[in-house]
């Protein structure tokens, strides 16, 4: 009842990625049914775009974030250090990074799942992007660019985590991916219903 009547947009964004990991078949079936019902609800597209855009702006305005990394104390890092004097890019939180890809995917699912219920089936970004493409919501090129950037970022992130490093790379290391993701982000956020 809460998810249908009172939940915030960000809670529905999180539901796009949610999946049951433990429970009886009956319980996991109920969860999947509720998740699908919430995701497939028809929404005010302009309000959705405003909510997602405002959420992302708040994240970017937050100049520092707290991150815990294995074997390291709590440290503060800029979300986008390339805007400071340090030429670094946060592959997760920086503009054109993983969060932007996730927000793009979540926005498209929440915007179109009432028409294409298969968009509510998967909870991982790669298969959701494939579904968005197969339903004509993403072009082949946009889907390809998002998947490639997401896979590149994840691979790079795993390598950094194995070295107990924060998810920061030199700003010039991911410029192609960043440009492609920010271009798609701009298109999605400018779409009005």
Please name every model-derived segment.
Residues 1-193:
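A nucleotide- and high-energy phosphate-metabolite-utilizing enzyme signature
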């Amino acid at each position: 009842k809460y998810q249908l009547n009172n939940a915030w947009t960000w809670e529905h964004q999180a539901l796009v990625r949610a999946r049951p990991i433990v429970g009886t078949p009956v319980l996991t079936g109920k969860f999947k049914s509720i998740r699908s019902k919430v995701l497939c609800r028809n929404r005010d597209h302009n309000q959705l775009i405003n909510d997602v855009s405002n959420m992302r702006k708040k994240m970017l305005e937050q100049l520092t974030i707290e991150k815990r990394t294995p074997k390291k104390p709590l440290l503060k890092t800029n979300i986008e250090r390339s805007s400071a004097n340090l030429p670094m890019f946060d592959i997760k939180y920086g503009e054109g990074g993983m969060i932007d890809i996730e927000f793009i995917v979540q926005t498209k699912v929440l915007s179109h799942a009432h028409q294409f219920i298969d968009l509510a089936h998967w909870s991982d970004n790669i298969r959701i992007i494939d579904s968005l493409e197969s339903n004509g919501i993403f072009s082949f090129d946009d889907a390809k660019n998002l998947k490639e950037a997401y896979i590149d970022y994840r691979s790079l992130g795993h390598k950094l985590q194995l070295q107990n490093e924060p998810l920061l790379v030199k700003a010039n290391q991911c410029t192609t991916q960043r440009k492609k993701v920010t271009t798609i982000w701009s298109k999605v956020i400018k779409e009005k219903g």
